Amino acid sequence: MAQSGFHGEKIKELLHLRDTPSSLIMRSVRGVNVAATETRDDNPVPGLSGRIVPEDAYIVSLKLRDYPDCEYWENGKCVAKPDIRAGTTYLYDMKYEPGFVIEKPFHSLHFYVPASALDGIAEQSGARRVGQLDCQYGTGF
């Protein structure tokens, strides 16, 4: 069975890291794991990042280092080549198997948030379920 989520050994494989990054994993009220992981590699192994198992979850990624001309992929195809700027946050929908070509040093803080965790927060707050979040790569906030 494929491991879901974006933390631990899985993120090590995806980003071709030498060491497994530490992750803070929290369990939401509905028993869903939410994780925060810092990744950094000053001398990365070049190549396309590993395959993400499609799931109904999001990665909120705060970029801590510039990454110019980032070749971004979805569903096995290059879809954009934006300049990533430190201090900018990006949202990735894991249903679209996001990936990128690793060819430069990188440093990011990733938050793995399953859609069911967002639904639980909405339910607990008496709000409508979130549904689909609009993830337009290359447009940070």
Positions of predicted regions on the chain:
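N-terminal regulatory/effector-sensing and dimerization cores
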Residues: 26-131
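OB/S1-fold single-stranded nucleic-acid-binding modules
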Residues: 1-19, 26
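Feature targets compositionally biased, intrinsically disordered low-complexity regions
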Residues: 4-7, 30, 75, 137-139
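Histidine (H) residue identity feature
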Residues: 7, 16, 67, 107-110, ...
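Generic structural signal of hydrophobic/aromatic residues within well-ordered alpha-helices
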Residues: 11-14, 21, 36, 121
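Short, Lys/Arg-enriched, Trp-marked, Pro/Gly-tolerant hinge/linker segments that flank
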Residues: 128-141
